Amino acid sequence: MLDIVENSTNGFNVIRGGMSYKHNDLRDMSLYKAYAKFERIPVFANEPVFDTMENLSDYSAVFNVALGRVLNMRPISKTYNLVSHQSAFDEQAKQIEDSNFDDRRVEVVDRLFEDGKKAHRTVYFTDLKHDINSRSIDDAVVPRIDIYNSIDMSWAFQIFSGAYRDLCRNSLVFGGQKAYHQKRKHTRGLDVPAMIGKSVLSLEMFDAQRDLMNNWARTILDAESFAHILRNTLCKKPEKKSADYIRPDARPVNEKLLEYLLEQFFEESKELGETVWAGYNALTHWSTHTIEARGKENQKQHDIRRKRQDEVRDVITSPDWLSLCEVA
């Protein structure tokens, strides 16, 4: 079902099933601060034989601090990745500010549903326009990024970016085109910064090089060909003397990174097919996925991200990549 967005006022508005708030500040989290601040609390069960309360240590209830009440929902397990709405949207704001969209005017629509358990944020880049194929006189649509999140296991964490008029959570968009879409369950492996980073980078490319992006989305790339490109670029180690190798014929390849990128390529291919666009998204996932570097001495996340983006740029401008994509 399509979301109904009210456009008439600039305060908190009542919409079907919840509340909405329209504003122009990526850092404005007032709706979530007022209605959706969560924390885990213990769950106890009554032991009937001895009439005692037992702590279910592997599960938690969720307390809405903003509303001062326990949410009516199933307990969540200790492996459930409880992503707060505010932390996800703060991360999005930071990455947009670090992107080519940092000086663009935005319109933000925040929505909360069911006592704050579900959230949907849309960021419109209002001074950008893209034409779409239609019979109407006004074919221009505004590029946007949509994020869906829940804290009660009802919605997966899901991101769309592109230029389209409407969308629904079953991955369809209407009146336009997606640049990026991905959804993940709230498991320990959910990497919110990486997903947000890919949505922003994909929209940047959609805005600046839409024809190239469409070419990549149509061009077939199998895992073997992708691995060949990686061995000659990103995963290629510096040259060493043959005496440094246990086997003189061993190829100087970072096998761990190669395996990681191929695994990510398989994940991207589930949504995008075995295409060059899936390969590019696997590369951008790595360039924005810096969790493994957190806490290391003298390593700053933004520096790591910039360095990796430069390395991705080297891959997509390499002879193997350009030849595959038939880009002059």
Question: PLM features: residue spans?
Answer:
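Feature for intrinsically disordered/low-complexity regulatory segments and propeptides
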Residues: M1-E91
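Intrinsic disorder/low-complexity polar-acidic segments
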Residues: D90-A328
